[in-house]
């Protein structure tokens, strides 16, 4: 969710930071340096903080879920790495300028590293990291509204240790600030300064669509005037300890940020994020260089010229570096050769999703079942594509499958359809997984753990595999259990894939049982959340049912379990998976020679044999051996010969012996026909693909 205005203003904000460190108007107009450089340009660092709040903390402020927490923790890790890199980068300059030394007391060194940084501009990183940790710990336990007002209170306290310090001197509260200075060296840090602007970023994200542009611009101008008056007063009638924190500064940012969001600049910097970061990081080295040169080049003693030279040199160096970096990566990037791949078609997946949505009720949504690694197609690849396409609920078979999805940044709710031991209940909560209650005993055991979790209640309507007894008293007893929030009710149809009379009678009984339970819950005004009953064949054979969700699995892969079984609703499906492997060698075999293991295949003439790097260990059925099973290369059919080995198979290349080594050979594209050939269902064939087969998005 990049925003061009935000990205381009990053560079402007970095230039403002450079100006603060160069004081360009110092000799030409000292008062202007105070009002412009040390006042207006102070929006720069809070702007960077607000970006973090806007993009990183907005989700955590709404819901304390694993994806939102993980996003924040990953962000903090990244900032720690940048801070470590910057510290190492500026260690020579810090030692040279005597900002730090080898004789520095341990306590002071700790304060420098945790609060100020080893050079004057590096305070930003510990402030951001500390503020992020503080805000995260608060949001996990307290509502955003309370956190916001706490952050605002901390900022007001911080004013007294910054620009308002001159006014609180010789007052009863001065000893408090003396203690703060002793511990933290000031209030421009991650405790008093950063949290409010992170919260403001979140607040703008929540309210961005509600604001009138003209009113926002008007309030921005009014608050900016207030900021200038405040600064003029504080600098004119007191001596601020620092001038980073003003009373009107948060107000200015609150109205400025939405204006930047709606800004659409015509001329833009390339790679603005990297440019602004490196401009912020590197400019002190350029300042040190121009300061040294100013002893011989007197014009550099003019602060404005010095500022412009610092900008030009730093930006020029960064642009050259980035250009060279991207050029180097372009030359270095090569597609790694894989012995075997399952190529996943995003286009086919989205087509299948649209076909499903076409036949279900407009009010019914899709809960994508991605168990068994998305039926062997690769959940890591499939789930993000579906989520981006609007799928807002996923289902898996086990807790570990759910955890893997979470670690691959899937944000939507995830339902665990199978059994999870109550001993793992903390993992359910940690990863924000919704657990199926599969029996009365399971419900009681989960509740006894005294850990609040989200659940869906599975009802055994007649399949007799998983689910609670379909009686209202049994179900109500589960609703009464503490710590279990039941946000959904579902069941599973055992014979929906057949349209013979017995199967249809059984299915109608299950539907009637499920509907009766829902009716009785409604009559008792029990809130049971969402409902779902149909899986893939339930969708095709009973499309007129109206529940909140359907649960397609094999349908999304573009296949049917059994193509010989007719369905009430026809759909146009596209297989999303193509199995490919490399041609790794080829050789000429004389007439009469046995090929491969045993003597099941003997060359009846001189034959060019190719070896392909895939075997039954990778999930290819060995029963396909010598069964007229054909591979293909650019439309050319390549018959499989001999017994399929564990890691390889052999093909007849007599009609196309010039295929280059390391060419990709198509092994399987029509999964349904191949499943029929080996007398199994498509589900099993796809799920057999082994872990050695790499996944790739087409």
UniProtKB/Swiss-Prot annotation:
Pfam families membership: Acyl_transf_3 (PF01757), Ala_racemase_C (PF00842), Ala_racemase_N (PF01168)
Catalytic activity: L-alanine = D-alanine; L-serine = D-serine
Enzyme Commission code: 5.1.1.-, 5.1.1.1
Residues that hold substrate according to the record: 465, 646
N6-(pyridoxal phosphate)lysine modifications at: 371
PANTHER family linked to this entry: ALANINE RACEMASE (PTHR30511), ALANINE RACEMASE, CATABOLIC-RELATED (PTHR30511:SF0)
Functional description taken from the UniProt entry: Catalyzes the interconversion of L-serine and D-serine, and L-alanine and D-alanine. L-alanine is racemized at a rate that is 14% of that of L-serine. Together with VanC/VanC1 and VanXYC, required for vancomycin resistance in E.gallinarum strain BM4174.
Subunit structure: Homodimer.
UniProt similarity note: In the N-terminal section; belongs to the acyltransferase 3 family. In the C-terminal section; belongs to the alanine racemase family.
Comment on protein domains: The cytoplasmic C-terminal domain is responsible for the racemase activity.
Protein name according to UniProt: Serine/alanine racemase
The species this protein was found in: Enterococcus gallinarum
Lineage, opening ranks: Bacteria, Bacillati, Bacillota, Bacilli, Lactobacillales
Name of the gene encoding the protein in the UniProt record: vanT
């Amino acid at each position: 969710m990049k925003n061009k205005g935000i990205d381009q203003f990053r560079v402007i904000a970095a230039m403002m930071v450079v100006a603060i460190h160069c004081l360009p108007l110092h000799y030409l107009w000292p008062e202007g340096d105070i009002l412009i450089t040390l006042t207006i340009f102070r929006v720069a660092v809070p702007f960077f903080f607000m970006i973090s709040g806007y993009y990183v903390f907005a989700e955590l402020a709404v819901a304390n879920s694993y994806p939102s927490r993980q996003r924040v923790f990953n962000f903090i890790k990244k900032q720690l790495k940048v801070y470590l890199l910057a510290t190492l980068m500026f260690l020579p300059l810090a030692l040279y300028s005597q900002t730090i030394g080898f004789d520095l007391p341990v306590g002071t060194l700790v304060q420098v590293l945790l609060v100020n940084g080893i050079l004057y501009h590096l305070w930003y990183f510990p402030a951001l990291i500390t503020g992020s940790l503080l805000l995260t710990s608060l949001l996990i336990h307290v509502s955003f509204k309370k956190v916001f007002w706490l952050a605002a209170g901390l900022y007001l306290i911080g004013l007294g240790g910054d620009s308002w310090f001159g006014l609180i001197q010789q007052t009863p509260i001065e000893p408090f600030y003396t203690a703060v200075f002793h511990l933290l060296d000031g209030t421009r840090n991650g405790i008093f300064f950063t949290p409010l602007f992170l919260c403001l970023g979140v607040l703008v994200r929540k309210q961005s669509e509600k604001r009138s542009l003209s009113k926002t611009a008007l309030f921005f101008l009014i608050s900016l005037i207030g900021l200038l008056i405040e600064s003029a007063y504080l600098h004119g009638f007191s001596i601020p300890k620092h001038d980073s924190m003003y009373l009107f500064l948060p107000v200015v940012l609150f109205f400025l940020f939405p204006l930047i969001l709606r800004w659409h600049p015509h001329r833009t910097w390339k790679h603005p994020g990297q440019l602004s970061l490196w401009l912020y990081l590197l400019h002190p080295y350029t300042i040190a260089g121009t300061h040294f040169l100013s002893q011989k080049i007197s014009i550099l003693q003019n602060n404005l010229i010095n500022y412009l030279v610092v900008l030009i040199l730093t930006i020029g160096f960064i642009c050259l570096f980035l250009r060279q970096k991207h050029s180097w990566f372009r030359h270095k990037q090569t597609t790694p050769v894989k012995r075997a791949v399952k190529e996943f078609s995003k286009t086919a997946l989205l087509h299948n999703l649209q076909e499903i949505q076409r036949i279900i009720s407009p009010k019914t949504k899709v809960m994508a079942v991605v168990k068994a690694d998305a039926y062997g197609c690769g959940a890591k690849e499939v789930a993000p594509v579906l989520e981006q396409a609007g799928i807002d609920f996923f289902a898996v078979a086990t807790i570990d499958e759910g955890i893997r999805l979470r670690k691959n940044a899937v944000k939507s709710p995830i339902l665990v359809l199978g059994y999870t031991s109550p001993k793992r209940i903390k993992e359910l909560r940690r990863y924000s997984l919704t657990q199926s209650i599969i029996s009365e005993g399971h419900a009681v055991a989960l509740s006894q753990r005294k850990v609040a979790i989200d659940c869906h209640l599975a009802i055994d309507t007649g399949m007799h595999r998983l689910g609670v007894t379909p009686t209202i008293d049994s179900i109500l007893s589960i609703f009464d259990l503490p710590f279990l929030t039941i946000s959904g009710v579902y069941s599973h149809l055992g014979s929906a894939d057949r349209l013979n009379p017995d199967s249809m009678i059984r299915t109608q009984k299950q539907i009637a049982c499920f509907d009766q339970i829902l009716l009785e819950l409604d009559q008792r005004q029990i809130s049971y959340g969402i409902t779902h009953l149909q899986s893939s064949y339930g969708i095709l054979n009973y499309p007129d049912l109206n529940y909140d969700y359907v649960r397609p699995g094999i349908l999304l892969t573009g296949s049917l379990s059994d193509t010989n079984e007719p369905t009430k609703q026809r759909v146009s499906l596209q297989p999303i998976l193509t199995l490919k492997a490399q041609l790794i060698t080829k050789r000429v075999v004389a007439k009469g020679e046995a090929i491969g293991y045993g003597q099941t295949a003997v060359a009846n003439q001189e034959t060019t044999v190719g070896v392909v790097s895939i075997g039954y260990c990778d999930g290819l059925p060995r029963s396909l051996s010598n069964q007229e099973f054909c591979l293909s290369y650019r439309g050319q059919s390549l018959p499989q010969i001999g017994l399929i080995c564990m890691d390889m198979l052999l093909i007849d290349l007599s009609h196309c012996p010039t295929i280059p080594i390391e060419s990709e050979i198509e092994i399987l594209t029509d999964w349904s026909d191949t499943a029929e050939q080996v007398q199994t269902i498509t589900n099993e064939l796809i799920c057999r693909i082994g872990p050695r087969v790499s996944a790739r998005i087409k």
